[in-house]
């Protein structure tokens, strides 16, 4: 079978709409005395593409935090492209006793102003003291 490929820049613009959902196969993270560090990976143990969200402790249990925020950092990497969200929101509820973080995120692409990723999480991970 011959594989045919064309550069998307050479194709005509079509009309319509579309959307995609990134399904995360793995969530990695930890919480220390400063922040929660969350990595959402579409492939197990692969850092070719991921969504990273870092939330400082002062934003825990504060409801949805609008982006940009000095207390919430985001980084989205899809293949060779990478950027930070400049709009959207992140919410993280934290239970110190159980080491459980639950929340939601909606991240907007700073280059196109379009929603790139949104989702929710409910994870338990080690607490570094």
Regions found by a protein language model. Give the residues of each.
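An extracellular/secretory-lumen and virion-surface interaction module
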Residues: 1-129
